[in-house]
Amino acid sequence: MTEMLKGIAASDGVAVAKAYLLVQPDLTFETVSVTDTQAEEARLDAALEASQNELSLIRQKAVDTLGEEAAAVFDAHLMVLADPEMIGQIKETIRTKEVNAESALKEVTDMFVTLFENMEDNPYMQERAADIRDVAKRVLAHLLGVELPNPATISEESIVIAHDLTPSDTAQLDANYVKAFVTNIGGRTSHSAIMARTLEIAAVLGTNDITERVKNGDIVAVNGITGQVIINPTEDQIAEFKAAGETYAKQKAEWALLKDAETVTADGKHFELAANIGTPKDVEGVNNNGAEAVGLYRTEFLYMDSQDFPTEDEQYEAYKAVLEGMNGKPVVVRTMDIGGDKELPYFDLPKEMNPFLGFRALRISISETGNQMFRTQLRALLRASVHGQLRIMFPMVALLNEFRKAKGILEEEKANLKAEGVAVSDDIQVGIMIEIPAAAMLADQFAKEVDFFSIGTNDLIQYTMAADRMNEQVSYLYQPYNPSILRLVDHVVKAAHAEGKWAGMCGEMAGDQTAVPLLVGIGLDEFSMSATSVLRTRSLMKKLDTDKMQELAQRALTECATMEEVLELEKEYIDFD
């Protein structure tokens, strides 16, 4: 029987294939009293080691196929496996209660999950709860000798159907066979959606109950552009979906022709399209997709991939490789953004109730705790500056004095290197990431002293709306097109231009096809996004008239009170079909 479902369009693409139901195994067990607690601890250690080996392999595959940024979630999982407090409590429970490892594991991890989930004002801890649940399931499966579903074994064209996909599930998908996936829960900003876009496979999330409606082998049609899903479609519907897929493939082929084209609007106005990267090897994707710059190089992955602080020489080689790989095109390097959801096992930071609003990023760099680490990074960057067009960006800036202090340290290290006879470029732009509302509101003062702004909308929207974008209960508040967000962006861009500086954007909003016309109208100079979004955005921009987009933006800023009103207004100016 044919059934039609509507979900959240999370990743573009159209596919028709057999359903592959990703069923979670039965992990029920009985609590058993034991006398040999040492043997139970040994069983636990073996399961922990097997899980660690498994996750390390999955992480490496994720790095190879998705890049460092997408793979970073597995660092959090590996840290859970190595958490001495939690592992210690599990072993203590085995010894004191004389129960099997399965029972002790569940008791302790359930306690931690409940504790973190109840921290409703702390999205960081709520995310850690999800990590613990995922890791505990893996360890329990090893204790029970049960195999977890392995999407890597899929060897024919399939549509993966699941209640949800964990990061470890998504990292194992082979885009040669998995043409799309559909889940009961999730949204555009969930880990699985982001990974689907990186893999360039269609995804529709949040269908509520597709796992109850689909059997293995059913034919499923998925449109990741519209969010439409059909179970056991008719021949006519299959033909319709295949035609839509061919149209999309044709579009992609047309976009590919724009690889070496300049990014100009229909009336000849140029905008810079840049790409975000996490490692030097991501530069290949930047160039293959025709980006004009690297708009955000997230340097924290250098630290997260090391067993100790990366040395000045190690960092220099990485920065040099990126600058040389870009052949003189601009490279915006963000100084390390450690803290929040990015922890380093070798860097002992104080535990905080809310790390996202705590001691992180530039706050660490300019403190006594992180000063030497910051100076090492700046020296490496300055040495590498002679190999290309370097731009240095400081993250998580709230106060002008924070920028001044960081800039002062940069100037000190520049003078030190010159005194040592080391060549340093004298043409390095220094800017800040605008992700805190306080900095956005004071952009007119910052603009007098910085060389550029890059608006980090992922955090700016969260902080402005007081809503965690990964929390489904409040995800409706994550509104890039809300007039309040558009007004903040407009204020920052105007402040930059008033001082003759440029303003860019490096959050997901920069590559959002609905947001781009509004941002063109506001006058944003640079758009930095995932490399795979560059050509599509260039194609869109070629159809836009800046005068009309300025009119659209002005009306959105002055006439609209809600996101819905902005979207309705945009329909008067843009036909997205």
UniProtKB/Swiss-Prot annotation:
Catalytic residues in the record: 191, 506
Cofactor: Mg(2+)
Amino acids binding phosphoenolpyruvate: 298, 334, 458-459, 469
Keywords: Cytoplasm, Kinase, Magnesium, Metal-binding, Phosphotransferase system, Sugar transport, Transferase, Transport
Main location: cytoplasm
Binding-site residues, Mg(2+): 435, 459
UniProt-listed InterPro entries: PEP-util_enz_mobile_dom, PEP-utilizing_PTS_enzyme, PEP_util_AS, PEP_util_C, PEP_util_CS, Phosphohistidine_dom_sf, PTS_EI, PTS_EI-like
Subcellular location per the Swiss-Prot or TrEMBL entry: Cytoplasm
A Gene Ontology molecular function term of the record: kinase activity
Catalytic reaction equation(s): L-histidyl-[protein] + phosphoenolpyruvate = N(pros)-phospho-L-histidyl-[protein] + pyruvate
GO cellular component, one term: cytoplasm
EC number(s) recorded for this UniProt protein: 2.7.3.9
GO biological process entries: phosphoenolpyruvate-dependent sugar phosphotransferase system
Enzyme class: transferase
Misc. remarks from the entry: The reaction takes place in three steps, mediated by a phosphocarrier histidine residue located on the surface of the central domain. The two first partial reactions are catalyzed at an active site located on the N-terminal domain, and the third partial reaction is catalyzed at an active site located on the C-terminal domain. For catalytic turnover, the central domain swivels from the concave surface of the N-terminal domain to that of the C-terminal domain.
Described function: General (non sugar-specific) component of the phosphoenolpyruvate-dependent sugar phosphotransferase system (sugar PTS). This major carbohydrate active-transport system catalyzes the phosphorylation of incoming sugar substrates concomitantly with their translocation across the cell membrane. Enzyme I transfers the phosphoryl group from phosphoenolpyruvate (PEP) to the phosphoryl carrier protein (HPr).
Oligomer status and interactors: Homodimer.
Domain notes: The N-terminal domain contains the HPr binding site, the central domain the pyrophosphate/phosphate carrier histidine, and the C-terminal domain the pyruvate binding site.
Family: Belongs to the PEP-utilizing enzyme family.
Designated name of the protein: Phosphoenolpyruvate-protein phosphotransferase
Protein source organism: Streptococcus mutans serotype c (strain ATCC 700610 / UA159)
Name of the coding gene: ptsI
